[in-house]
Each structure stands twice: as C-alpha cells, then as structure tokens.
Amino acid sequence: MIEAARRELAQGGLRAMSFRRLGDAVGATSGALAYHLGAKAAILNEVVTRERLRDRRWHDEWLERLDGLERVDRQALAAILEQYLDALVQGEARLTQLIWMDLTLRAPRDAEVATLVAPWLAERRGFWSRLFEGRIEDAAIWAGLAAAYVTDEGFNGLVVGDDPDYRLLRRMAIDRLASRLERDGVGLEPLFSRLVRRMDRRLGLPTGDVAADAMGPGPRREAALAACHVLVDGGAEALTHRAVAERAGLSRSAVGYYFRTAADLFKAAISGVYLIADGRGAPPTLPPGADPTLWRGQTVVRGELAVILAAARDPTLAPYVIDQRRWRGVSYVRLLRSKGYSGLDALDGQTASMIATGQTILSGVDGDDRRDPLVSWLIARHKD
C-alpha cells in the first residue's frame, strides 16, 4: 500500500495520491483504505519517512564508496559530482528524486510539507559536509556549493540526463565549478555557446522571446501572469482554464480565447515566469513580513521547478527545460556583469545561476538563505 502511494506521489504528485487511485492500485475501496490508514497526511508522512531512510542508505553507500579518498582535489570533485548526478536519476533513486522534487516545490507554501522535508534536507546537506570535511580547504563552502548545484542540476537530469549534448554542457559546468571558474579544459568559449545553439535547433525550441506575445498590458498578459501564479502555487497539474480564470478575474472563455489548449496555457505560464523574472509582472501576493526581492526570486525559481517537474512526467515538455536553463544563465551573467564582474563569460553565468537557483530551492524548505555568500565566494576572483 505504501509502495503504491510512493509511486503515485512520484509519478503524479501529491494531488494524484488519492484514496480512489490508491484503491485502484491495490484492489481496495476508498472507504476501507481511509478506515485502516487514516488521513492522507498520515500516508504522506509514512511515505516520506521511508523515503528518507532509503535516501540515507543511498548516501551512506556513497560515503563508504569514497572512504579511501584522502583529498578532494579539482579532478576528484568533478568526478564525484558527475557520477553522483548520473546515479541520482537511475532506478529507484529516480523515484526518490521525483518525490523530493515534488515536495520541495510545495514546501514554501505548505507548512506541513516543509516540516516533513526539512529534516530530509538536513540529512542531504550533512552528506556533503561529511564528504568534504578534512579533505578540502573551505570545506563548509564547498559543501554548500555542492548541495546547491546538485539540487538544480539533479532536477534537470530527470528530464534530459541521457542527452549527449546536455551531458557535455553539464560536464562543462561541473569543470567550471570545480575549478572555481578557471578557464581551461573542455569548458571554453566558443564551444559552450555553439553547443547551446546546437541544442536549440535540434530540440525545436520556441524561436524568439517566449514571453513576447504576453508583454503588452491587457487581459492576455494578466492571464499569463495568473497562469504562472497557478503553476507556482499548485504545479502543472493545477493549471486549468478554470483555475487561471479565477486567479485572473476573467471568464473561462476569455482565457480560452487567448490560450486555447492545455499546451498554450502551459506556455503562457512559462511566459509569466519570464515576465516576473524581468520585473515586468508581479509575483503572487507577498506574505506578511517577506522580503519583496527574495519573494520574487523564489517565485521565479518555483515556476522553473514546476516546469522541470512537469517535463519529468511528460517528456514532450523537455525543450522548455533546456530553454529556461539557457535563458536563466544568460540573464544571470548580465546581472553579475552589471555588479562589477565584467569578465564573466556565458559558462560562468550558467554555473553561478545554478548555484543561486539550487540554493533558492533549498532555502524555500529550511529558510537557510546562503545564496549570495555562496555565489560571491565562487565569483570573487573575477571582480573588476
């Protein structure tokens, strides 16, 4: 029964983990399951408890595997990150990663989910601390960088981890991270930018600016922003014409006029993410006491995370994952250059953006926002 709940949660999200679906999976009635198992929250708690144990054992195997490693130098760090990311999306670990991703997306807006996930996050952070302690200088910083990087990259790997072009791009980012943004090896311009353009053509990504059609003021733009808000709050499974209409204060027919199909609505939600990231649209209502700048950044990251999670369950959406990863790197390097790091190149921006995004995801779970210190340390030697 709990295994059935685990697979429903991994493949369809929290909304899919209903008594009806679970009953169909195990041949029992919804009433019988409710009687024997109690509330849905109790089932989720049991699933997460077992998943944490499975994940803890998986990470303990990694510590045992690397027990004889005396020093973590640049080559060792790159090898560890690459092999770890490969293993993270294989076999049973893939289901664990899907569950982890779904819950980290919900945690910032669901205190009960955050309470379940925070101890799990502490264990994952602890893995990197134990791995690096006594083996590398600035071990605490490297542990933070690794935890942030594998969070973002690990989610992307669920979608395109087997793609040769993506794997080469990933290796470039790993080498750049492990070298603290030194320029040598495979990760040199113009190879990086050419490879990105190759992926654009091969994957058939949308041309031009995805958000262009929703830029002008008016109901179309409001509907796109509302779609983004629904995506951020409830994930792709919550994205319906009715939900968007209610959020935007429009009729369902009006939303359907601008975004006819479910695919159109999904693209509109992505457009909304871009609009908010560029400061041309408002995020969902600011919680009391929240920092507006941080809240905007968290909204963008949760929107991106929702897109990745949807693509992990529907491979036809994979091009959007590559597109937003590329777009984010380009935007972030512009931001860093404007702050006095004019020498950073596109790969630097891509690498730093993954640290920033991964750490923002994690801070949404436990409130430990060390994003700026981590990125500042990574790029410090490139200050003008």
Task: Label every PLM stretch briefly.
Residues 10-46, 230-264, 268:
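Helix-turn-helix
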Residues 114, 118, 133-196, 212, ...:
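Hydrophobic/aromatic-rich alpha-helical bundle segments in the mid-to-C-terminal region
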Residues 92-101, 105-134, 297-305, 315-340:
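Amphipathic alpha-helical packing segments from all-alpha helical-bundle domains
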Residues 1-21, 25-28, 49, 200-202, ...:
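Short, amphipathic alpha-helix enriched in basic
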Residues 46, 57-95, 146, 279-305:
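Hydrophobic alpha-helical connector segments
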Residues 106, 225-233, 247, 254-258, ...:
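Long compositionally biased, domain-poor regions of proteins
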Residues 8, 55, 97-107, 117, ...:
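Short, structured motif recognition centered on aromatic/hydrophobic residues
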Residues 49-55, 271-277, 283:
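Short, basic, alpha-helical segments at the C-terminal edge of helix-turn-helix-like DNA-binding modules
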